[in-house]
Amino acid sequence: MTVQTFYLIGEKERSTRELDVGDPKTVNALRQGLAEVFNILSAEGIDFHDCHGPISTIESILRSESVGITVNGHPVRYPQQPQGIPIFGNHFEIYPDHLGNHERLFNKYGSVIRTNNMGRVTYLTNDPDIAALAFRDNDYFTKAPSSASHPLYGIRDQTALFLCDTESPAWKEAHKFIPPSMTPRAVRHYTPLLQQSVDTVFNVLDKFDNNGQAFNVYHLTAKLASQVICQLVLGVDLHHFDAVDSPVHPIIVLLQRYLTLNRRVQTKGAWYSYLPFGDPVALKNTRRELYGLIEEAVITCQKKNGGTTGDLPIQTAALHATCLVDYLARATDEHGNKLRHEYILSNTLALVGAGFVTSSAFLSWLIYSLVEYPGQQDRLLQELVDHGAVSDKRWTYDEIQALPFLDAFVKEAQRMHSPSFQPARNVKKDIILPGGWALPQGSILIPSIPHLHHHTAYWENPDRFDPDRWRTEKVKNRHRSVYVPFAAGPRSCIGFNVALQEVKISLAELVYRYEFVNATNEGIEYDPDFIVIRPVNFYVRAIRRTEWPARSP
């Protein structure tokens, strides 16, 4: 038996332990064992010290009186936060510009920061090594919106794939049925439906052009994204573009209100959510009303398709379904089981909600990138012409995937202007992260997507819009977690194939038909009270094209 005393430098009194280390053959084997004992998530970062300084051999470690441990050259340390004020904590240090202020705090305090927002404590990181660990669902991290500090707590639903805890019984069942509806094969089947939905916007854009009228881009893309997603999920035409002033469908009105109210409640202390008036009550009432409308839509869709369709194997059902609700009603696993009705209802809402909010904001930023960065719109138009675009072109999935500049443009826009920013994960144990950062059990860690995407250590000139960077070996061989627009791991976005095909078809159709011109007379602002980053005051004109470039030689 070989016993040695180990402790974490920076926390010697609390962490000192006498451990039987057996007969370790290598320093790396000892590191692995100690990482498990102390919940250090980067065993390779462990270094050893005695009273004289660093030690690096098994012999020196075992003969020392006691051995201190550092992680990646750092003692154990706790993330810092700005000095708060009573009741409000750091609220006014962060909002309204939470993107800019979190960047400032990363620069000041390091790669993991702590914020106290009216009593609600959250940790954020811009370190891709830490993000990669957080996105794993294992003994140390999970996704649990049922935790009161989680950003999705106000809209949690233990029967919905996106909104339930990983440990919820529904997650395993829903995860079995829903992802097959979003595979590349399935998206290939849905591509004509996506294009048909996108093309409905032409009626309104032509009228804007005839009147010489600029428009608020997010107002338009919110209508467009919801038109597309409701056609895809529910098989219903929202008639958003029958006329310039066509009203937004009640489902979408309620959905936007629901998500805004949740953000308002979750960016304040837990106490705020218990108030018997104001936003917390409105959130509950909106939830009830929204679920009612979704249930009506699901039942209507099932009745419409129920008389002429039959059950299909789960792996091929999406290739024959008219929409995702039709798929969920028909998909059958190897045991003849189907997704239960209550799961269909909640996951339909989750699919509509997640698909709408992300795509609507991202489409806005894509149009922003067309008009803000010189030459990009012309390059994209040229590529479309070179690949056979015409006014009545019916794009296939493979044709859209074969447009390299379109792909690079979308990637770069998503890097520069990611609408998603808070893929929160729950810490299951007291842990020590790379860099020696200690987080307590029960805390919330958010890998901050915008700050990962702009990290100067991993991106050359990160504030420069450069689609060509995606052709370089440096970017092709980048750290896997420095670009995570759809998060990563088992709880990543399952709809990314659909989302990317939707925005690519939208760009192909819109850029071929219209030239977009910036009509904004002030700096672009984003909405701090929404669940994604969306521009609120961005205006453009869409001018109908009358001529196109010749094909490249």
From Swiss-Prot:
Induction (free text): Expression is controlled by the asperlin biosynthesis cluster-specific transcription factor alnR.
Pathway linked to the protein: Polyketide biosynthesis
Gene Ontology process terms (BP): secondary metabolite biosynthetic process
Location in the cell: Membrane
Gene deletion effect: Fully eliminates the production of asperlin.
EC number: 1.-.-.-
Keyword Heme recorded: yes
Protein name, as recorded: Cytochrome P450 monooxygenase alnD
Name of the gene this protein is made from: alnD
